[in-house]
């Protein structure tokens, strides 16, 4: 099975022959009784993945980041659908600035891994999945255009990828990856700043309620 999985700081996105899906890159070390997210059992521990109130995967070092691997393995297990065993050919990404330093280490940490995991929407609905990650390709985030639209990278080109918690900027010269930058910015950070400003200015506890009142 060929899969592209992008474990972003905000959301985890997965694409395969079946189509695509995404969930929030959050992990809780407990099981929620009522939840629209996913429940997994991995190495004897139970987790809730994708819950609004969970902790986001924010570590720069993806190799040793527990949340990164839990989100990655959850995405693969969910993509397996009705299959219980699969051999995975994986494409994933790293923040542009850390690509050269972490690429080989990440490939080494994932390639050949045999993973057993249970996944479901409740503890009572868990299904056993087992997969082997046979091959791993790692791209710098924001470099997908190399595959989807290489003709646009003529001459000197900058590609900007605005994520939830980071902005990746990649400089290309005639399709060659030259300089990467990763800025700790993003739409979630912007949204939090706007919410803070509105709360401060209008002295409201819930921005959504205030907006709804103004609309009427």
Question: Which positions does each model-derived feature cover?
Answer:
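Nucleotide/phosphate-binding catalytic cleft detector across ATP-hydrolyzing
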Residues: 1-159, 175-189, 209-216
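Long, contiguous, structured domain-core segments that constitute the functional module of a protein
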Residues: 40, 192-197
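Short hydrophobic alpha-helical module
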Residues: 145, 172-173, 197-201
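A cross-taxonomic marker for long C-terminal extensions/tails that follow the last structured domain
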Residues: 157-178, 194
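A mobile "lid/hinge" subdomain adjacent to the ATP/sugar-phosphate binding pocket shared
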Residues: 195-216
């Amino acid at each position: 099975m060929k899969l592209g999985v992008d474990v972003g700081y905000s959301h985890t996105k997965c694409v395969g022959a079946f189509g695509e899906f995404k969930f929030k890159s959050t992990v809780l070390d407990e099981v929620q009784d009522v939840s629209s997210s996913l429940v997994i059992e991995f190495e004897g521990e139970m987790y809730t993945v994708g819950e609004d109130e969970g902790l986001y995967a924010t570590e720069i070092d993806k190799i040793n980041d527990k949340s990164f691997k839990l989100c990655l393995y959850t995405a693969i297990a969910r993509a397996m659908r009705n299959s219980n065993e699969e051999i995975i050919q994986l494409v994933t990404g790293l923040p542009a600035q850390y690509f050269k330093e972490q690429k080989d280490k990440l490939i080494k940490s994932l390639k050949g891994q045999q993973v057993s995991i249970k996944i479901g929407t409740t503890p009572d609905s868990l299904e056993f999945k087992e997969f082997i990650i046979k091959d791993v390709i790692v791209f710098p985030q924001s470099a997908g255009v190399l595959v989807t639209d290489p003709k646009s990278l003529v001459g000197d080109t900058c590609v900007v990828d605005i994520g939830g918690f980071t902005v990746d900027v990649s400089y290309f010269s005639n399709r060659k990856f030259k300089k990467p930058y990763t800025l700790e910015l993003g739409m979630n950070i912007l949204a939090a700043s706007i919410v803070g400003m509105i709360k401060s200015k209008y002295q409201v506890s819930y921005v959504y309620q205030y907006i709804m009142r103004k609309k009427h």
